[in-house]
């Protein structure tokens, strides 16, 4: 059972990051070249912005899948628990 935050798995194929964001907290725009990203909210609600043009509201049971070349930023609309899976493209 994964309970700690930060990078919880990091090997040659995948990185898994567990994040906890307080309401109103943001993640600045960045990208992950060479990776396919799967972004899922376990608890709470966030808005994910891709390339500063597309907005995706995410709640539990929803997964956003996108190319790591895209620039992502995030804003927590409620206190949120998030898992991000960064899979190496082959």
Q: What positions do the PLM features span?
A:
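A short glycine-rich, His/Asp/Glu-containing loop-to-beta-strand
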Residues: 1-28, 35, 87
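A generic "binding-loop/recognition-motif" signal
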Residues: 14, 23, 34, 54, ...
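Short beta-strand segments in beta-sandwich/barrel cores
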Residues: 17, 26-27, 44-49, 63
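Short, surface-exposed secondary-structure edge patches
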Residues: 18, 38, 53-57
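Glycine- and acidic-residue-biased ligand/ion/polar-headgroup-sensing regions
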Residues: 34-46, 51
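A cytosolic small-molecule/anion-sensing beta-strand core signal
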Residues: 42-43, 59-60, 78
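Short acidic-glycine-tyrosine-enriched beta hairpin
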Residues: 52-69
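Ligand-binding loop in jelly-roll beta-barrel domains
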Residues: 68-90
């Amino acid at each position: 059972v994964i309970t700690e935050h930060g990078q919880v798995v990091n090997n040659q194929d995948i990185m898994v990051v567990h994040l906890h964001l307080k309401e109103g907290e943001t993640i600045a725009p960045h990208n992950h070249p060479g990776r396919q990203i799967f972004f899922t909210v376990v608890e709470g609600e966030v808005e994910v912005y891709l390339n500063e043009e597309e907005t995706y509201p995410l709640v539990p049971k929803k997964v956003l899948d996108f190319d790591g070349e895209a620039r992502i930023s995030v804003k927590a609309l409620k206190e949120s628990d998030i898992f991000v899976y960064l899979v190496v493209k082959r």
